[in-house]
């Protein structure tokens, strides 16, 4: 959506009904809100996602800086990541699906998928390309010239920019960040 009021109402829903508290949670669940609405329109019942896939490969900035060079730290990072439903907004995505009576299939959080790669180090998974352990089986992907990992909300989707600007324009034109506005929505200051 591009209409400011529709974006703001969606943000309010994600904060008040789904329980999003962080800026990244709002931005990451924003497209799922509309995807689920389209699924309902067309009679879809099950949402299959790739959410949390990057956790297996340690492609976040934090993981690449702090865990990619030490095998034990990398393994511990992934064990912690996948033992916490807050990772990758999974808990909130589950709630959004429940509220809309959509079944969620999130295979990257399944123990069978976790066990595939937990004993591999960062280099084994990501050299010479990110996610090499998978990509080597799909040479047709090479033609797509896939760029290195970019967070969904920060890449060319412009979700963070569009959502942030909508709430800033509605509530506080001189704000540099939407975080304070999100907090006020959560507290009920902005109805």
Language model: regions and residue ranges:
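Acidic, carboxylate-rich catalytic segments that either coordinate divalent cations
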Residues: 172-191
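Mid-to-C-terminal catalytic subdomains of enzymes
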Residues: 47, 52-72, 84-175
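PAS-family sensory domain signal
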Residues: 78-82
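ATP-dependent adenylate-handling ligase core
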Residues: 1-39, 58, 62-72, 121-125
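A structural signal for alpha-helix termini and helix-coil/disorder junctions
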Residues: 17-20, 140, 188-191
